[in-house]
């Protein structure tokens, strides 16, 4: 199997973007608005970076870095100067994705960042309910999660996912709840298995949250699942506090940088 047979590209995209970077927010702010120092701003789901053109600023045979800088348009909806870099490095059967956020302003920078890669189900038969499995680790018996409720935001209630030998079966109706958001650093690796429980792709990450999502509640025969490392998440229903006080926010002092990464591993390629 080649990389293109595992990672979903634009040809299978249901929305206008595929594998987008989520910045400067992950998910939604309540009513698509937020407050910062007495001003109210509007931001759509997952922020604006995924809709903007990045500049190629570094390139070699197996690596590249793309850069996005704040400008007049971003400052209208997000009043923070920044430089966002996304790096990619191919090493054997591993794709490393690296993020760098730099605060180029003279005041604290508040942000969230996340990934949204999508992966094909292997040997999908749309006429059946079976899709495959997610392996969270054989020692994990239960996981706590939250899911979107009103207007794409969450309620405080937590739910428990019970696993059998660390496995979550993926079926046509698995994502009736929309998204499983696992927080509090419960997971550091997720492996996607085929219907015979053979592993073919893994994600390794250090993010405090990771989400699992597929739009199968709306599109029952969609052929992919998303595994999404997040440094942040959507608002709680009804939140109207300050932007900087949202849950799971990241903060940078002037001149400081935030760096993080995750890896995609093709398990049956050496």
Regions found by a protein language model. Give the residues of each.
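Short, small-residue-biased leader/transition segments that mark boundaries at the very start
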Residues: 1-14
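Short acidic, Pro/Gly- and aromatic-enriched capping/linker segments at domain boundaries
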Residues: 15-35, 46, 248-249
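Short Pro-Gly-centered flexible turn/kink motifs
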Residues: 34-38, 99, 250-267
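Extended, loop-rich substrate-binding clefts of extracytoplasmic carbohydrate-active enzymes
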Residues: 39-92
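Acidic/His-leaning functional-site neighborhoods
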Residues: 46-58, 163-247
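Acidic, contiguous internal or C-terminal segments within carbohydrate-active enzymes
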Residues: 70-124
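Beta-strand-rich interaction surfaces with strong enrichment in secreted/lumenal proteins
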Residues: 85-87, 247-252
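Active-site/ligand-binding surface loops and adjacent short beta/alpha elements
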Residues: 108-110, 121, 125-206
């Amino acid at each position: 199997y080649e990389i293109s047979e595992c990672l979903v590209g634009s040809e299978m995209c249901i929305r206008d973007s595929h594998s987008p970077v989520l910045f400067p927010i992950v998910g939604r702010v309540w009513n698509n608005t937020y407050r910062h120092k007495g001003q109210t701003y509007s931001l759509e789901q997952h922020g604006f970076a995924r809709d903007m053109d990045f500049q190629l600023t570094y390139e070699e045979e197996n690596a590249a870095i793309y850069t996005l800088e704040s400008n007049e348009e971003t400052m209208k909806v997000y009043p923070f100067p920044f430089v966002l870099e996304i790096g990619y490095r191919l090493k054997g059967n591993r794709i490393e994705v690296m993020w760098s956020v730099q605060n180029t302003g003279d005041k604290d920078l508040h942000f969230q960042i996340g990934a949204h890669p999508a992966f094909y189900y292997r040997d999908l038969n749309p006429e059946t309910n079976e899709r495959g499995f997610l392996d969270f680790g054989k020692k994990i018996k239960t996981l706590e999660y939250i899911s979107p409720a009103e207007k794409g935001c969450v309620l405080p209630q937590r739910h428990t996912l019970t696993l059998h030998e660390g496995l979550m079966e993926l079926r046509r109706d698995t994502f009736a709840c929309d998204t499983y958001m696992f927080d509090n650093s419960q997971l550091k690796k997720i492996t996607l298995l085929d219907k015979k429980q053979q592993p073919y792709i893994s994600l390794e990450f250090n993010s405090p949250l990771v989400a699992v999502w597929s739009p199968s509640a709306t599109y029952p025969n969609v052929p992919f699942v998303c595994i999404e490392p997040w440094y942040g998440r959507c608002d709680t229903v009804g939140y109207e506090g300050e932007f900087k006080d949202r849950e799971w926010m990241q903060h940078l002092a002037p001149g400081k940088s935030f760096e993080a990464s995750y890896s995609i591993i093709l398990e049956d390629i050496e």
